[in-house]
Amino acid sequence: ALTLLQKGHKVEILDFGKSDSIPLKKSKTFKSVKSDAQFSANFFYGADLEGINEPNDNEVFKYPVRRPSISTVNMYDNEEDTRQFQPIFSNYKGGLALAWGANSIEFNQDDMIGFEYTKQDIEAAYKKAYKRFHVSGPVKDDDLSSLVNESHKFNSSHDMCSADDAFKRYAMFKYKFFPKNKNVLIGQSRLAIDNRLNSNQKCNSCGLCIWGCPSNSIYTPLNTLKDCQKFNNFKYTNNIKVSHFISNNGIIEYVADTSGARYKVDNVILAAGAINSAIILLKSLKENKITDKNLIRTAGLLDTEVIKIPYLSLSKMFKPFTTDKIQFNGLMAMVKNRNKDFPSWTQVELLSLGSLIYQ
């Protein structure tokens, strides 16, 4: 949307657009929140303490209850077939990116297998995006630099907790003595975190990443939405639940919402998330008599299994527990793929769950 606005086009966003919980003040840290027993109980577990894990709870990781933007309940009343997996939804302004990550990894040419364009064709767009997102990473090349974000040189880095440093040092020690055994490469993650020295949004290691960054250091689409709202040729309409498109001779002329209202359009970009975009598209096909099937099932990314491997850092067992980087991924890894039908390397997320555990 911002790129179109900068080129002089008129842009209107139709969004459901609820607002997520407001982050705490910039002066707050994990330790300061925890020091107030009554406030911290409400903050971490909810007013009714519904966020406390049950004895038989087998989930390794949960998003906090104070982030309603992350939910397993879809506003489309489960019209989609999700029997093979449990999807995560966001019905909030900014979408899943409000609490989903900040990982910023570009495709390399090896990833472009099967595409009709090359890495070079999209490299300029990557550079513009990284500048806009203030992506931070290793200022000096690491073991991943030839595989990840090869075209981008980082001007700022993000801090890593002591557990991250210990994990990375162990990997480097292993490579030093076993140089031929480099099937798993570990390095600093590439994150959309504004960590520039002169930035007033610089990360201060408060430890509240997953509960909402008080410094607004972590990029979210809300940042770009604010930039869009500076243009006179931009309109944002929320409280809209899009139902389907109405076409004439294969050309989309209207967007219809669930209340029956129609919105005249010239061009449409569908960006309602992987599942809800599919719901809107499939309903559009049926409403416009392009298909009469009630269910179209394809195999896709969300049908694949996720492999979770817990890792215990024994060297940290007798060290003080740190709260500067709780539940955030300061490291990433690339694993060599032996299947010739896939790219040579597969990305692995190393999720820090405190000082002792990685997932």
Q: Where would I find each of the regions flagged by the language model?
A:
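FAD cofactor-binding and catalytic pocket of flavoenzymes
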Residues: 65-89, 96, 258, 294-359
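Short, polar/flexible loop-turn hinges at active-site or ligand-entry regions and domain interfaces
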Residues: 110-118
